[in-house]
Amino acid sequence: MKIFIDTANVEEIRKASELGVLSGVTTNPSLIAKEGRDLKEVVEEICSIVDGPISAEVISLEYEKMIEEGRELSKLHKNIVIKIPMCEEGLKAVSVLSKEGIKTNVTLIFSSMQALLAARAGATYVSPFLGRLDDIGNPGIEVVKQIADMFKIHEIKTEIIAASVRTPMHVLEAAMAGSHIATIPYKVIIQMSKHALTDIGIEKFMKDYEKAFGESK
């Protein structure tokens, strides 16, 4: 399973990229607004850091305007993926953009049927939201598994991006459920790298070395 980072914070993206684990980035209007910067400016800087799919979301909810925004955003860089919300207008926009060779990521997916419609409209990616489904008592990972099974049975090439990831366990569950990608906040990526026994082991190695050879420089 590939790892994307879910943020518009360039410094977080830079730090995660230095780990050598990133395959792409997802952003949304809320994340861009949090940074207080121009969308195009942020997206262009992200593209200079990560050589992989970069999802940038349209703002409009009318399909003609979605198409216009999508076309403009796609001109920024070859790696741009147009992120479009799951709705009737969004599906129409995805259908048009995909026929023009523009990659799309249909977001705010909360059911396998929504994912099927998005895939058949031509979406490159679908993004089911684990955490938000969990919040309403509907295990998000079950939806991811349904989508993965359905896509496999019907040989659908659309890739699944597990989104609204809040914990390392979400990442593990997504990987085991068959998600192609998980888009993960920076803090969760760092949490994934840690384990109490690793810290204890490192401390013991250092103490043993210092005992045998003196303090390391």
Curated annotation (Swiss-Prot):
EC? 2.2.1.2
Q: Which CDD domains match?
A: Transaldolase_FSA
Domain of life of the organism encoding this protein? Bacteria
Q: So what does this thing catalyse?
A: D-sedoheptulose 7-phosphate + D-glyceraldehyde 3-phosphate = D-erythrose 4-phosphate + beta-D-fructose 6-phosphate
Where are the disulfide bridges?
A: none
Give its localization: Cytoplasm
Q: Which NCBIfam families match?
A: fsa_talC_mipB
> Which family does the record claim for this protein?
Belongs to the transaldolase family. Type 3B subfamily.
This protein is called Probable transaldolase
What does UniProt list as this organism's lineage? Bacteria, Bacillati, Bacillota, Clostridia, Eubacteriales
* Chain's gene name: tal
